Amino acid sequence: MAEKQQAVAEFYDNSTGAWEVFFGDHLHDGFYDPGTTATIAGSRAAVVRMIDEALRFANISDDPAKKPKTMLDVGCGIGGTCLHVAKKYGIQCKGITISSEQVKCAQGFAEEQGLEKKVSFDVGDALDMPYKDGTFDLVFTIQCIEHIQDKEKFIREMVRVAAPGAPIVIVSYAHRNLSPSEGSLKPEEKKVLKKICDNIVLSWVCSSADYVRWLTPLPVEDIKAADWTQNITPFYPLLMKEAFTWKGFTSLLMKGGWSAIKVVLAVRMMAKAADDGVLKFVAVTCRKSK
């Protein structure tokens, strides 16, 4: 395992338990109406809504004859997306993550919810997944690709394991799209993004235009992208408020150590970068060609 991948695995092995108060069995941001005041009581509904909005964006059908029969969640965290989709559609879901601790947690949640026959989880490398070509009717990833250095290979691997006609969904942090006259981000923008990435073990962030560019030569169709930045920013004040109470700070420190505290410190930078228009949160989807 490459050094960077090992660092990501250790980060999640050590800090996963710190975030359950905010996310439950999910490890991704929530989806809010712009301008909403986020609350702890509503955070669980918001993270589930993020999944549903992504599925809706990808035009996943509720029709029993058209809905997918199998799903792969790449970078599955502690299993929340698989568990939700398995319950929502009654289908078989598989998750893959680089963290053995996350697999252990995910399997525990599956057993608690009586879904151990519907979902399963593997420890593995997203750049070299142990699945045959064309295996899954839906391939999904949320807030995972940011950790990956070779994002283009990650996308090729998602397309490889998708069945013909399968929707492919990418939800992630990104940077703003460049204007036609720009060759790169401004130096000060790069500096801010590097600080954010270093604090939360992200490799780097690309733009939604990069995702579209990498997908275009592959055997996919109906590529589209959306900017959901305004739908996640309501969560930033909530996390900072709760994390900097004595109870919140000590809980994060005890359950997640310094890794968890660094994430909270990064959130302050993320909020400002989003306000400045540098940091984005995007959804990209397409379908594997038949």
Curated annotation (Swiss-Prot):
GO cellular component: plant-type vacuole membrane
Reactions the enzyme catalyzes: picrinine + S-adenosyl-L-methionine = ervincine + S-adenosyl-L-homocysteine + H(+)
Temperature sensitivity of activity: Optimum temperature is 22 degrees Celsius.
Residue span of region SAM motif III: 161-170
EC number, as in UniProt: 2.1.1.-
UniProtKB keywords: Alkaloid metabolism, Membrane, Methyltransferase, S-adenosyl-L-methionine, Transferase, Vacuole
UniProt keyword Signal, yes or no: no
CDD domains: AdoMet_MTases
pH dependency: Optimum pH is 7.5.
Tissue: Accumulates in tissues actively synthesizing monoterpenoid indole alkaloids (MIAs) (at protein level). Mainly expressed in young leaves and, to a lower extent, in roots and stems.
Residue numbers covered by motif Vacuolar targeting signal: 133-139
MF (Gene Ontology): N-methyltransferase activity; S-adenosylmethionine-dependent methyltransferase activity
Residue segments, region SAM motif II: 134-142
UniProt pathway: Alkaloid biosynthesis; vindoline biosynthesis
Pfam families: Methyltransf_11 (PF08241)
UniProt family annotation: Belongs to the class I-like SAM-binding methyltransferase superfamily. gTMT family.
Name of the protein in question: Picrinine-N-methytransferase
Originating gene: PiNMT
